[in-house]
């Protein structure tokens, strides 16, 4: 029995990267759709200094990494005043005019003006003072958030973070290196916050205040769930049950986690809610293999994967039920894994294995009308995580050679961007988790 259980526990961890190679003989492709979005041109009063050019380049990249705007910096000469903007030759709907004042060595004041075609007044303006050049990318993301919010009415996500796992030598018997990495949303400013050899790190998930990451790991001869305090690097083990302890995620208020436990050497796992103060458990499911739980934004429901009817699918359970009970999300879905609510609670994004297509894609389920829409068209797409304001989804894609990449797609499926690519098959990228807020 114990030998069988060890195989099950090992399988939980290797599934994360084996799913990437499950369809290794098939090509993963994502196409970018064509959609008419307002065009923003970013211009500057300084095209000589390196700092203004760098900031504006990041702003343009940010404003192209979303579903609502597109941007360019086609004007390569200085524009000092709004009267100098060549609107007739521009196809832009808006211009973002950036003005840079070099106060002292490596210190700038930056004024940002948003102008609209056929409008002689400033639409919006803001000034950032005493900016050190070391904060170049942070400043650019702040400006992008400002512009995005003013032009779309939605909060920008350009100061959010991504946590993900990088595995080196993943197929070696010994010497496998697992690193938990936090980066900017666009893959820059990477920091390794946890490093382990031969002890897997799996399914990291943020707390809503952005202070903690909860994850599962196999350490000291057994599987457990841990929290990492990001500011200090302090790691705390919070479960020590026999068998499987996996797939943890925080409740919206941060007082509980949902997780999957086998509670002994069983081939079944069930969903539980753990109170982090008392460590008391509430059981949510009663049969089958149940895993990957995520709370709804209001904390009243949990969505998860279960094979109770013969194949993996998505189920929903109320956290307030007196007895364990849950229902299948939709009979339209053939096989599904790794569900995530969007922040408004109106959609569920998941890994979809349709009966009509080969491989796995990232799909969106509309809770209002029950529609299911694939938003990627690769053959081995997995591990979706939704941006904190719901516009974008980050996920893992794997190509025919087994190379994994961290990619991003808009929720409507029209825009696709690469964040990071493993340059050889000896490195795997796994389990992305989008931070709950801007930093």
Curated annotation (Swiss-Prot):
Signal peptide (residue range): 1-24
Keywords: Cell cycle, Cell division, Periplasm, Signal
InterPro entries referenced in this protein's UniProt entry, alphabetically: 6-blade_b-propeller_TolB-like, PD40, Tol-Pal_TolB
SUPFAM superfamilies assigned to the protein according to its UniProt record, in alphabetical order: TolB, N-terminal domain (SSF52964), Tricorn protease N-terminal domain (SSF69304)
Biological process according to GO: cell division; protein import
One Pfam family linked to the record: PD40
A Gene Ontology cellular-component term: periplasmic space
Cell cycle is among the record's keywords: yes
Keyword match Chloroplast: no
Localization annotation: Periplasm
Physiological role: Part of the Tol-Pal system, which plays a role in outer membrane invagination during cell division and is important for maintaining outer membrane integrity.
Sequence similarity: Belongs to the TolB family.
Quaternary structure and interacting proteins, as annotated: The Tol-Pal system is composed of five core proteins: the inner membrane proteins TolA, TolQ and TolR, the periplasmic protein TolB and the outer membrane protein Pal. They form a network linking the inner and outer membranes and the peptidoglycan layer.
PANTHER family: PROTEIN TOLB, PROTEIN TOLB HOMOLOG
Official protein name in the record: Tol-Pal system protein TolB
Organism: Francisella tularensis subsp. tularensis (strain SCHU S4 / Schu 4)
